[in-house]
Design a protein with these regions (language model features):
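Single conserved hydrophobic/aromatic residue that forms the stacking wall/gate
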Residues: 1-5, 9
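Extracytoplasmic/periplasmic soluble domains downstream of a signal peptide or transmembrane helix
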Residues: 14-168
């Protein structure tokens, strides 16, 4: 899969049997400090889950997910409110709904099993978002979360969440 966001995240996305493999590896397996963007190992590779998570390093040179924290500003969100996820089988438009800082052990990284858990995830995301999207989210909407390290406190993460819609 490759992901493109306002020409910011034009990168291929890997997936492994765990969430460690691509932290410091390129898609071909060679060591690299920046690693590779990668999908959570628990997700279906075809993005068919209700909640798909993609991780990437917050690189100071704005590569990988280094520019994700720019979504802490309303103005940046307004100029970049839509992303595109392009995969070999299906392309998706992602309407962003929330961006916020959360601990690495946050419930956003758990896969909700009940409607109540999903509602709680969405409420937390929207209540903590550093921008206002004004977008209504339904229980049937599939979500994409992009996650990167953040430095407000130990083990902080910046997450950017959006609604995943098939296109084309």
């Amino acid at each position: 899969a490759s992901s493109a966001a306002s020409d910011v995240y034009k990168r291929q996305v890997g997936q492994s049997k765990d969430n460690e493999y691509y932290l410091r590896r390129l898609l071909d397996g060679t060591w690299n400090i920046a690693g590779t963007l990668f999908m959570d190992y628990r997700n279906a590779a075809d993005c068919s889950d209700l909640h798909t998570i993609i991780y990437g390093h917050n690189m100071k040179n704005n590569t990988m997910f280094g520019s994700l924290p720019k979504y802490s500003k309303q103005e940046y969100y307004e100029e970049h409110s839509v992303l595109y996820l392009l995969t070999p089988k299906q392309n998706y438009k992602v309407k962003l709904i929330a961006g916020y800082v959360t601990p690495s052990d946050s419930k956003v990284y758990e896969f909700e099993k009940t409607k109540e858990e999903r509602s709680g995830l969405l409420k937390t995301a929207l209540d903590n978002s550093l921008f206002t999207s004004g977008t209504t989210v339904s229980d049937e909407d599939r979500l994409l979360t992009l996650s990167t390290c953040s430095y407000e406190y130990d083990n902080a993460r910046f997450v950017l969440m959006g609604i995943l819609k098939e296109i084309g």
